[in-house]
Design a protein with these regions (language model features):
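PRPP-dependent phosphoribosyltransferase catalytic core
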Residues: 12, 149-207
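Gly/Ser/Thr-rich loops at beta-strand to alpha-helix junctions
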Residues: 70-75, 140
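Short, glycine/charge-rich flexible loops or terminal/linker lids adjacent to PRPP-binding catalytic cores
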Residues: 86-132
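Short glycine-rich phosphate-binding loop at a beta-alpha junction
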Residues: 63-70
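Short Gly/Thr/Asp-enriched flexible loops that form oxyanion-binding sites at enzyme active sites
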Residues: 75-84
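Short, hinge-like loop/turn segments at secondary-structure boundaries
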Residues: 84-85, 105-110, 177-180, 198
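Acidic, divalent-metal-coordinating active-site segment for phosphoryl/phosphodiester hydrolysis
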Residues: 135-148
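Active-site-facing substrate-recognition patch
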Residues: 2-62
Length: 207
Protein backbone atom coordinates (compact mmCIF):
# COMPACT_ATOMS: atom_id res chain seq x y z
CA UNK A 1 0.00 0.00 0.00
CA UNK A 2 1.40 3.38 -1.01
CA UNK A 3 0.26 6.71 0.44
CA UNK A 4 -0.56 9.16 -2.35
CA UNK A 5 0.36 12.71 -1.21
CA UNK A 6 -2.34 14.73 -2.99
CA UNK A 7 -3.37 18.27 -2.05
CA UNK A 8 -6.76 19.85 -2.55
CA UNK A 9 -7.00 22.40 -5.36
CA UNK A 10 -7.50 25.19 -2.82
CA UNK A 11 -4.45 24.15 -0.78
CA UNK A 12 -2.29 23.83 -3.89
CA UNK A 13 -3.31 27.27 -5.14
CA UNK A 14 -2.71 28.87 -1.73
CA UNK A 15 0.76 27.33 -1.50
CA UNK A 16 1.76 28.48 -4.98
CA UNK A 17 0.33 31.96 -4.36
CA UNK A 18 2.45 32.30 -1.22
CA UNK A 19 5.60 31.40 -3.15
CA UNK A 20 4.63 33.84 -5.91
CA UNK A 21 5.10 36.56 -3.33
CA UNK A 22 8.54 35.19 -2.49
CA UNK A 23 9.58 35.04 -6.16
CA UNK A 24 8.34 38.58 -6.79
CA UNK A 25 10.96 40.07 -4.46
CA UNK A 26 13.08 42.65 -6.37
CA UNK A 27 16.24 41.09 -4.94
CA UNK A 28 15.62 38.01 -7.10
CA UNK A 29 16.09 39.86 -10.39
CA UNK A 30 19.66 39.12 -11.49
CA UNK A 31 21.84 40.93 -14.04
CA UNK A 32 20.77 39.92 -17.54
CA UNK A 33 17.11 39.90 -16.46
CA UNK A 34 17.20 36.43 -14.91
CA UNK A 35 15.08 35.30 -11.95
CA UNK A 36 16.86 33.60 -9.04
CA UNK A 37 15.09 30.34 -8.10
CA UNK A 38 18.03 28.21 -6.96
CA UNK A 39 17.08 28.42 -3.28
CA UNK A 40 13.67 26.86 -3.99
CA UNK A 41 15.41 24.02 -5.82
CA UNK A 42 17.51 23.42 -2.69
CA UNK A 43 14.65 23.18 -0.15
CA UNK A 44 13.42 19.57 0.20
CA UNK A 45 10.25 20.47 2.12
CA UNK A 46 9.21 23.06 -0.47
CA UNK A 47 10.04 20.79 -3.39
CA UNK A 48 8.13 17.91 -1.82
CA UNK A 49 4.94 19.99 -1.79
CA UNK A 50 5.52 21.42 -5.28
CA UNK A 51 6.26 17.93 -6.58
CA UNK A 52 2.99 16.63 -5.15
CA UNK A 53 1.08 19.53 -6.72
CA UNK A 54 2.63 18.91 -10.12
CA UNK A 55 2.04 15.16 -9.88
CA UNK A 56 -1.67 15.57 -9.08
CA UNK A 57 -3.04 15.91 -12.63
CA UNK A 58 -0.99 12.95 -13.89
CA UNK A 59 -1.97 10.09 -11.57
CA UNK A 60 -4.72 9.02 -13.96
CA UNK A 61 -2.28 8.94 -16.90
CA UNK A 62 -0.12 6.43 -14.96
CA UNK A 63 3.33 7.33 -16.33
CA UNK A 64 6.00 4.67 -15.98
CA UNK A 65 8.71 7.21 -15.24
CA UNK A 66 9.55 10.91 -15.01
CA UNK A 67 12.11 12.23 -17.50
CA UNK A 68 14.25 15.32 -16.98
CA UNK A 69 17.53 16.60 -18.35
CA UNK A 70 20.55 17.42 -16.22
CA UNK A 71 21.14 19.32 -14.04
CA UNK A 72 19.09 22.01 -12.26
CA UNK A 73 15.75 20.34 -12.87
CA UNK A 74 16.73 17.08 -11.16
CA UNK A 75 15.59 17.93 -7.58
CA UNK A 76 12.11 19.04 -8.69
CA UNK A 77 11.72 16.11 -11.08
CA UNK A 78 12.77 13.70 -8.32
CA UNK A 79 10.00 14.98 -6.05
CA UNK A 80 7.42 14.65 -8.83
CA UNK A 81 8.60 11.07 -9.42
CA UNK A 82 8.44 10.39 -5.68
CA UNK A 83 4.86 11.67 -5.47
CA UNK A 84 3.87 9.45 -8.40
CA UNK A 85 5.82 6.49 -7.06
CA UNK A 86 7.78 6.01 -10.28
CA UNK A 87 11.39 6.00 -11.49
CA UNK A 88 13.32 9.16 -12.39
CA UNK A 89 15.18 9.00 -15.72
CA UNK A 90 17.81 11.65 -16.48
CA UNK A 91 18.89 12.62 -19.99
CA UNK A 92 22.48 13.81 -20.31
CA UNK A 93 23.95 16.82 -22.05
CA UNK A 94 27.09 14.78 -22.71
CA UNK A 95 27.37 11.04 -23.25
CA UNK A 96 29.16 9.16 -20.45
CA UNK A 97 31.04 5.98 -21.37
CA UNK A 98 29.78 4.10 -18.30
CA UNK A 99 26.18 4.37 -19.56
CA UNK A 100 26.79 2.10 -22.54
CA UNK A 101 25.24 2.74 -25.94
CA UNK A 102 22.99 5.79 -26.14
CA UNK A 103 20.52 7.60 -28.37
CA UNK A 104 21.53 11.23 -29.02
CA UNK A 105 19.44 13.98 -30.57
CA UNK A 106 20.08 17.59 -31.52
CA UNK A 107 17.61 20.25 -30.47
CA UNK A 108 17.26 24.02 -30.57
CA UNK A 109 17.36 25.84 -27.24
CA UNK A 110 14.37 28.17 -27.12
CA UNK A 111 16.05 30.81 -24.97
CA UNK A 112 19.21 31.27 -27.02
CA UNK A 113 18.44 29.56 -30.31
CA UNK A 114 21.57 27.42 -29.89
CA UNK A 115 21.94 23.89 -31.23
CA UNK A 116 22.43 21.50 -28.30
CA UNK A 117 22.58 17.74 -27.79
CA UNK A 118 20.76 15.42 -25.43
CA UNK A 119 21.53 11.73 -24.82
CA UNK A 120 19.88 8.82 -23.05
CA UNK A 121 21.16 5.28 -22.52
CA UNK A 122 19.33 2.73 -24.66
CA UNK A 123 18.67 0.55 -21.63
CA UNK A 124 17.14 3.41 -19.57
CA UNK A 125 13.58 3.01 -20.92
CA UNK A 126 11.55 0.52 -22.96
CA UNK A 127 9.36 0.94 -26.05
CA UNK A 128 5.68 1.23 -25.17
CA UNK A 129 6.25 2.93 -21.82
CA UNK A 130 4.72 6.27 -20.82
CA UNK A 131 6.78 9.28 -19.73
CA UNK A 132 5.99 12.45 -17.81
CA UNK A 133 8.53 15.12 -18.76
CA UNK A 134 9.52 17.55 -15.98
CA UNK A 135 11.88 20.53 -15.86
CA UNK A 136 12.56 23.39 -13.47
CA UNK A 137 12.29 26.27 -15.95
CA UNK A 138 11.26 27.03 -19.50
CA UNK A 139 11.05 30.15 -21.60
CA UNK A 140 10.07 29.02 -25.08
CA UNK A 141 9.96 25.26 -24.60
CA UNK A 142 13.00 24.28 -26.66
CA UNK A 143 14.47 21.86 -24.11
CA UNK A 144 11.04 20.40 -23.40
CA UNK A 145 10.49 19.76 -27.09
CA UNK A 146 13.91 18.09 -27.23
CA UNK A 147 12.86 15.66 -24.49
CA UNK A 148 9.59 14.91 -26.28
CA UNK A 149 11.52 14.14 -29.47
CA UNK A 150 13.96 11.99 -27.51
CA UNK A 151 11.05 9.90 -26.21
CA UNK A 152 9.77 9.49 -29.76
CA UNK A 153 13.13 7.91 -30.66
CA UNK A 154 12.45 5.30 -27.96
CA UNK A 155 8.79 4.73 -28.99
CA UNK A 156 7.74 6.07 -25.59
CA UNK A 157 4.50 8.04 -25.21
CA UNK A 158 4.70 11.43 -23.49
CA UNK A 159 1.63 11.79 -21.24
CA UNK A 160 2.41 15.35 -20.16
CA UNK A 161 4.99 18.06 -19.57
CA UNK A 162 5.33 19.73 -16.16
CA UNK A 163 7.54 22.76 -15.49
CA UNK A 164 8.04 24.53 -12.19
CA UNK A 165 8.61 28.07 -13.56
CA UNK A 166 7.59 29.31 -16.99
CA UNK A 167 8.67 32.69 -18.31
CA UNK A 168 6.32 34.09 -20.93
CA UNK A 169 6.87 36.82 -23.48
CA UNK A 170 3.78 38.76 -24.47
CA UNK A 171 2.51 37.41 -27.78
CA UNK A 172 5.48 35.09 -28.32
CA UNK A 173 4.66 31.50 -29.40
CA UNK A 174 6.06 28.53 -27.53
CA UNK A 175 8.23 26.04 -29.37
CA UNK A 176 6.24 23.36 -27.53
CA UNK A 177 2.67 24.25 -26.55
CA UNK A 178 1.43 21.52 -24.22
CA UNK A 179 3.16 22.62 -21.00
CA UNK A 180 1.65 22.63 -17.50
CA UNK A 181 3.60 25.00 -15.22
CA UNK A 182 3.21 26.08 -11.58
CA UNK A 183 4.52 29.66 -11.74
CA UNK A 184 4.13 32.08 -14.64
CA UNK A 185 6.74 34.86 -14.77
CA UNK A 186 6.24 37.90 -16.98
CA UNK A 187 9.13 38.52 -19.36
CA UNK A 188 9.23 42.16 -18.22
CA UNK A 189 11.33 42.28 -15.03
CA UNK A 190 12.47 45.29 -13.06
CA UNK A 191 15.34 45.22 -10.56
CA UNK A 192 13.53 47.87 -8.53
CA UNK A 193 10.00 46.48 -8.64
CA UNK A 194 10.76 42.79 -9.02
CA UNK A 195 9.20 40.19 -11.27
CA UNK A 196 5.49 39.74 -11.92
CA UNK A 197 4.78 36.16 -10.84
CA UNK A 198 1.39 34.47 -10.64
CA UNK A 199 0.02 30.91 -10.42
CA UNK A 200 -0.61 29.05 -13.66
CA UNK A 201 -4.28 29.26 -14.72
CA UNK A 202 -4.95 25.52 -14.29
CA UNK A 203 -4.38 25.87 -10.53
CA UNK A 204 -7.27 28.32 -10.30
CA UNK A 205 -9.81 25.99 -11.94
CA UNK A 206 -12.21 24.60 -9.36
CA UNK A 207 -12.32 20.84 -8.85
Amino acid sequence: VRFVPRLSQASALAYVQELCGVLSDPGRVLPGNFLYIQDLLSQPDTLEVLGAIMAGPYFAAAPDFVLTVETKGIPFALMVARALGVQLVIARRDHKAFEGSVVTINYISGSGGEMKTMSLAKRAVRPGQKALIVDDFTKDGGTVRGMVELMQEFDVTTVGVGVMVERRREGAPRIYEDIRSLFIVSDAMDARQGAVVHPAPWLEVQE
